């Protein structure tokens, strides 16, 4: 395989990514690839730089130095909205749903980067706008079904915690991402909810061809679902490889996995 073929197989390439806050180096010269149709997990202790790296991938933070290429294009200076339009979606550690909107309307809200109707068309309810709205509602319902959400008209705040987490993923899918960033999606879940969400993440790859970058502290989830795992410590990459390789890395066993290595 040529270098060009290798590059073409990566949906995201990060080179020398560094982020400095004042005198604190939060992420230090990290190289990182995400292959197409893969699940890559980013692990490390609190303060390792994982969420900072996420925020730079999504465009919420500017890099201090280094570069990102997405789908072969340099996106280093693109903001979050532009990257979302190109196909980078994300969820956050804390649930950010519209609590007094229905599950369906929450997903519709996630389609704002894809809808083409104009304000004038919306005011006068043009045929094109009505057709786009029907199609959007059908697609939102399909995404709720895919995520396993039954109560389409239920307020988001009244859904179970597990359903709220899956609703966040459904809303992120509404923007038609090619790469989806999931920041601790199983946090606070019981084992049954975790199993359902883990299965959903796997289906993103298998059924929709979406690449996933995952921050996750539950090592059983990381080791069971990831194609590759990268470990950060104090903002630096200390290990990278297939789950079985990372699992056997003495630095990782000592610093991050601990007793979870047997899980």
Predicted regions and their residues:
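Glycine-rich phosphate-binding loops of nucleotide-dependent enzymes
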Residues: 2-263
